[in-house]
């Protein structure tokens, strides 16, 4: 197991990985200091941090100052009614993300191109672009069996 996600309360979950913990959502216990971004926001922030990491690596290798770098993300969301879900619930998804990269350093055209290529190499965006498959299984603790989604 690489990451363990645990329900806390309300709509708050925590994820543990390599000794680090991230918290998402809001609990109903009044402990606002334990609340965090919603999971979709954390997902999108992860993309920005991944892009930033690849740019930082490129800038370090090229001797380009990047201490003041920011990556500003704007997301596009699509919401549709689900005709296939029994509840008829609305389903939303992020359909696109615009990332604006800001660096204070004076850059040549070649450096600009290199930075954009580095940004495009982000592991998360490459995984999404190539088609990320997620398989959910439900473990029946009492029966000690596993059910996969269809």
Predicted regions and their residues:
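Alpha-helical metal-binding/catalytic segments enriched in His/Glu/Asp
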Residues: 50-51
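Extended beta-strand/beta-hairpin segments
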Residues: 1-45, 55-150
């Amino acid at each position: 197991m690489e990451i363990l996600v645990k329900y806390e309360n309300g709509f708050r979950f925590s994820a543990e990985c390599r000794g680090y913990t991230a918290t998402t959502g809001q609990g109903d216990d009044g402990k606002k200091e334990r609340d965090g971004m919603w999971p979709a926001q954390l997902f999108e922030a992860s993309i920005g941090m991944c892009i930033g990491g690849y740019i930082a690596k490129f800038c370090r290798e090229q001797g380009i100052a990047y201490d003041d770098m920011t990556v500003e993300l704007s997301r596009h969301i699509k919401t549709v009614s689900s005709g296939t879900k029994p509840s008829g619930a609305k389903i939303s998804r992020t359909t696109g993300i615009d990332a604006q990269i800001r660096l204070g350093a004076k850059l040549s055209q070649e450096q600009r191109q290199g930075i954009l290529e580095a940004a495009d190499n982000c592991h998360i965006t490459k995984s999404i672009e190539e088609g990320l498959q997620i398989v959910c299984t439900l473990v029946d603790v009492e029966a000690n069996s596993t059910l996969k989604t269809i």
